[in-house]
Structures are given as structure tokens and as C-alpha cells.
Amino acid sequence: KLGVPQPEGGYATSQKEAIEVAKRIGFPVLVRPSYVLGGRAMEIVYDEMDLERYMKEAVRVSHEHPILIDDFLEAASEIDVDAVCDQKDVIIGAIMEHIEEAGVHSGDSACVIPPQSLSPEVLDQVRDYTRKIALALRVKGLINIQMAEKGGKVYVLEANPRSSRTIPFVSKAVGIPLAKIAAKVIVGHSLKSLGYMDEPKPKHVSIKEVLLPFDKLPGADPVLGPEMKSTGEVMGIDYDFGRAYYKAELAADNVLPLTGKVFLSIRNADKTELVDVAKKLQAAGLELMGTEGTVNYLAQHGVFMDVVKKVHDGSPNVIDMMRRDEVNLIINTPTSKQSRRDGSRIRRAAVDFKVPYITTMQAAIAAAAAIETMKKGEELTIKSINEYHKEMEEENKV
């Protein structure tokens, strides 16, 4: 009706029907029970065998409890929008670009205001779809819309006519009390009468980072996916992405090292993007090491580093080095079953030995940018949130 693109999808009430729907859409697909919170029992499945396992182990499907099956947009950038609508006008509080790609639960992904890599054309699509959806739903108050961008095209994943968990972050980032505005709209005020008609345009960069509880969960693998695992959030603000991201990681107690050793063990799908990350880390003076496959790949692209044994090949390996406090950062994105077992042990050891760790390539790219900025001698801005808001107010008066 609105002409807003969304990923192809369907639902199933039996295993046979689920396989038929998935084949029609094409793997990989995102599967979940028909009503879940926090991504509970949500999973990305890559083939028919994986789907059969999910149907048997993860959910009980029936006519009363169907499962939803959607096309999974691989390598897409996920976007969150928080807005207020009074059934006539719509004000966008902020467009948030997720650091992690689509596939990591929105509650577990770091995100940035304003977006750093989305084109003006994509942002215009996001604004257009937000207004169309909010007005068509006759929303009176807050609405949160999740979208994904792939190849310059924006898809709407879901629209929730309610407050979202990002409202406190957005309000602090842009200096506008969205919940208060929405409450006044609900009781009859218009956005125009309240003086809020324009989308805020902050000059500073705000990063939301999550707090993960794995240090309280012995043995749990700290890997991110469609099921939400975080239990809190922190925020970093500065005048560029690098410093804001560094502050956010500092607040999350995942302090990015400016000296020392970095261990790399990356799945094949991520290796193309790894080259630039490795070059930035090496140029920043960090010493790199990794497993044989990663080391050989980077050597072909002019980045040379030390080889460390895989965990299943025996000692000395990276876990031994963490135990001796010889590793300052772990970057690990596993894929195969053996690598997954090794990766799980490495990530768990990083939590246990309190070594900063990264499990997605997008977070590695962000971390490399932050380290590069800090190594250039950039000073962290020490300023209250009120001072950032005052600067925005003064700019808007001009």
C-alpha cells in the first residue's frame, strides 16, 4: 500500500511447510516464533538441514504457534529510527546506524548518531519511509522503526508504535526530551505548538555501546547473534567517531589498547575487510599475531605477523598467552565447527582473563578507527552533556 520495501517472508505451521517457505525465499533465512521479545529463539539458518534442526530443537510449531520466516539480508547495514507523530506531523529524533551488521540483535549492537557511512540518498529514503509509516498507522506518540540498507536500497524490518530501548540514548545524544514530547502529544498537543518540527542535527558524535553479562555466566560463549544478551548500555560522546567510540568502549570496560599485542583469527568471509584493519593496527604500533590461515592471507597482502597455534593443536596457544597476560586484544570471528569450538574457548578465556575482545568484523573496523585516531595524539574532549546540548541550541539560533 505504501510502496515501502521489506524482506520477503512467510510463516509456517509445520516442518514441511517451513522448508517449502524457506526454499521459496532462498537461504539464508531468519526464523523465529510468531511472538517473541528480545529475539528469544530467533536464529539465522543457512540450509535445509539447519532448518530441520531448528524446528526439532528450538521451537514447538503448530497452527496456534506458527513460526515466521524472513529473507536474511546478509552484509546489510541495520538502522534504527525513533520518531514522534501527532497524526499530522512527524519529527525524527534520530537516525541510528548500527555498528554490527543485520543479524545481531538491535539491543546487542553498538550504534552511532549521526550515521557515519549511509549516503544522503539512503537517509532520505529512511526519512520518507518513517513519515509514511507513522502517518499511515495514525501513531499518536512515539514510534520506533528498524530498517536495513543493502546496495543503496532500504528495507523496513519492523515498526513498533511505542517507546523503544533507544529513547534514553537518543534524547541524551540530541538534547531533546522525546518521551516528554510524546506524552504531551498523546494528551492533545501538536508538535507545531510544542515547537518541535525539525530533525536535530548534532555536530558531535554519540555512540551507544552495550554491557554484556558474560563475566557473571561461567562457561557462556560471548558471541553475538539474533537473540539479545546484553543487560545494560553506556554512551560515549566526542567530536569525531574515533574518540566517541574509544570513550564508549572505555565505559563498557572493553578498553581498546594503544600498545601491545593483538590476536587475529578471522573467518574466510571477513578476510577481505581484515586487511585494512590489520594495516591500521600495525601502523598504530600494535604487534599482530594470529592462526596460520589468517597469517598466510594477510602476508599475501603485505601484512606480516607471528603465527600462533590453534587451540586444538596444543600449547603454546593464545589461551596460554592470555593466561600469562601477553595479549591485549582478541579479534575472533569463527565459522567452521572446529573453529567454532576453538573460538568459543578463546572468547571465553578472554572474558575470564579480562582481555578486551571483538567478535564481529564491523566492531573490529570501528575499533581500528578509534585506535588510529587516539594514536594520532587526539585528546579526548572532557565536557558535560549539558555543554554539548548548549552548543546545539546556540547553533540552532543562528
From Swiss-Prot:
Annotated Mn(2+) 2 binding sites: 158, 160
Major enzyme class: ligase
Keyword Manganese included in the entry's annotation: yes
Known pathway: Amino-acid biosynthesis; L-arginine biosynthesis; carbamoyl phosphate from bicarbonate: step 1/1; Pyrimidine metabolism; UMP biosynthesis via de novo pathway; (S)-dihydroorotate from bicarbonate: step 1/3
Location of region: Allosteric domain: 256-398
Repeat in keyword set: yes
CDD domains named among the record's database cross-references: MGS_CPS_II (cd01424)
Positions with a binding annotation for Mg(2+) 1: 146, 158
UniProt keyword terms in alphabetical order: Amino-acid biosynthesis, Arginine biosynthesis, ATP-binding, Ligase, Magnesium, Manganese, Metal-binding, Nucleotide-binding, Pyrimidine biosynthesis, Repeat
Domain ATP-grasp residue range list: 1-187
Region (Carbamoyl phosphate synthetic domain): 1-255
One example of a Gene Ontology biological process annotation: glutamine metabolic process
Binding sites annotated in the UniProt record for Mg(2+) 2: 158, 160
GO cellular component: cytoplasm
Span of domain MGS-like: 254-395
Catalytic reactions of this protein: hydrogencarbonate + L-glutamine + 2 ATP + H2O = carbamoyl phosphate + L-glutamate + 2 ADP + phosphate + 2 H(+)
Function: Large subunit of the glutamine-dependent carbamoyl phosphate synthetase (CPSase). CPSase catalyzes the formation of carbamoyl phosphate from the ammonia moiety of glutamine, carbonate, and phosphate donated by ATP, constituting the first step of 2 biosynthetic pathways, one leading to arginine and/or urea and the other to pyrimidine nucleotides.
Family, as annotated: Belongs to the CarB family.
UniProt free text on domains: The large subunit is composed of 2 ATP-grasp domains that are involved in binding the 2 ATP molecules needed for carbamoyl phosphate synthesis. The N-terminal ATP-grasp domain (referred to as the carboxyphosphate synthetic component) catalyzes the ATP-dependent phosphorylation of hydrogencarbonate to carboxyphosphate and the subsequent nucleophilic attack by ammonia to form a carbamate intermediate.
Subunit structure: Composed of two chains; the small (or glutamine) chain promotes the hydrolysis of glutamine to ammonia, which is used by the large (or ammonia) chain to synthesize carbamoyl phosphate. Tetramer of heterodimers (alpha,beta)4.
Protein name from the UniProt record: Carbamoyl phosphate synthase large chain
